[in-house]
């Protein structure tokens, strides 16, 4: 998605995605109800979920805060053993287990309900989510990386979905969801030199360690960013 500046081709799509009553206008498409119209309108479908791959090298462009605000950034890194096992000459049969009937319909129904604001997460559990992100907000705000309504709304939706999809919902699952959202929604926007983000990364790491290993994914990523900062005096999420 970032072989070109994303804003040049994706900004209109993001706007339509957030305003369902503002349909796409398609040039050259005739509306069947009015053959005189040269421009048709297409509403954003509720069952459309966008997943894009990102290339990270010197030939690509990083995403802007506008895009990052509306996305969950999921970083995939291959396991060392999986990489080196490619040298093996033995071929392995690939087995794909099909999803059970009704999974896609259930997922769509869950997405619609969560988008409408429904949540079965207990108040005390959501209060714990708020406490952790309040501490994170206080740290990021001092450095100009505070998050706003959209980010909070999407984090809450993620927590609600995690609750429904989890086989059990204890402290470990709550902090796992918090950890994933800190990693996917907050950290990707952080970048800068040692003076700009050095202290902030230290304070965010302290928040992760306050919860033991429950925010382990974010703690490891922060350590990686601090390593870059020490080596080249600049760090970013990727």
Task: Name each model feature, range by range.
Residues 1-238:
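C-terminal regulatory/interaction module of P-loop NTP-utilizing enzymes
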């Amino acid at each position: 998605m970032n072989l070109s500046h994303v804003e040049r081709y994706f900004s209109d799509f993001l706007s339509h995605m957030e305003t369902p009553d503002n349909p796409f206008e398609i040039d050259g498409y005739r509306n069947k109800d009015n053959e005189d119209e040269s421009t048709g309108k297409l509403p954003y479908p509720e069952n459309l979920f966008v997943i894009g791959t990102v290339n990270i090298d010197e030939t690509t462009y990083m995403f802007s805060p506008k895009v990052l605000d509306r996305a969950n950034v999921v970083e995939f890194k291959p396991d060392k053993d999986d990489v080196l096992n490619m040298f093996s000459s033995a071929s392995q049969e690939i087995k794909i287990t099909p999803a059970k009937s009704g999974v896609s319909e259930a997922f769509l129904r869950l997405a619609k309900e969560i988008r409408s604001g429904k949540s079965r997460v207990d108040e005390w559990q959501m209060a714990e989510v708020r406490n952790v992100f309040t501490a994170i907000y206080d740290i990021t705000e001092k450095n100009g990386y505070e998050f706003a309504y959209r980010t909070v709304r999407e984090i809450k939706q993620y927590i609600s979905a995690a609750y429904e999809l989890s086989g059990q919902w204890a402290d470990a699952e709550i902090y796992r969801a918090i950890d994933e959202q800190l990693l996917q929604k907050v950290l990707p926007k952080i970048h800068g030199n040692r003076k700009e983000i050095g202290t902030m990364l230290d304070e965010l790491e302290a928040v992760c360690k306050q919860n033991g290993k429950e925010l382990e994914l974010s703690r490891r990523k922060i350590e990686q960013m601090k390593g870059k900062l020490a080596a080249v005096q600049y760090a970013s999420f990727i």
